[in-house]
Amino acid sequence: MQVLVRDNNVDQALKALKKKMQREGIFREMKLRGHYEKPSEKKAREKAEAVRRARKLARKKLQREGLLPSKPKPAFGADRRPSAAAR
């Protein structure tokens, strides 16, 4: 995997590299290969991931059809945490 470093801007090149690696799924693969996973554990994990994906797809479909309310989006510029004075 190659990333061009322009004008000696290493930070920008590192950011681009991380983005490429994330897109390729390298971080996820490194995490999975960090230790041995028994075939039964792998099967259970993959099944749980499939269930999660199916639920998410069904939820998105219901939201599109208007049967489920979608999550309210935070107001632009709104601070999520209360200020130090309000605590």
From Swiss-Prot:
Molecular-function annotations in GO: structural constituent of ribosome
Compositional bias annotation for Basic and acidic residues: 35-52, 78-87
Transmembrane segments annotated in the record for this chain: none
One Gene Ontology biological process: translation
GO cellular component, one term: ribonucleoprotein complex
UniProt keyword Cytoplasm present: no
Keyword line: Ribonucleoprotein, Ribosomal protein
Region (Disordered): 35-87
Keyword field contains Ribonucleoprotein: yes
Compositional bias segments (type: Basic residues): 53-62
UniProt-listed HAMAP family: Ribosomal_bS21 (MF_00358)
Family designation: Belongs to the bacterial ribosomal protein bS21 family.
Name this polypeptide is given: Small ribosomal subunit protein bS21
Organism: Rhodopseudomonas palustris (strain ATCC BAA-98 / CGA009)
Gene (name only): rpsU
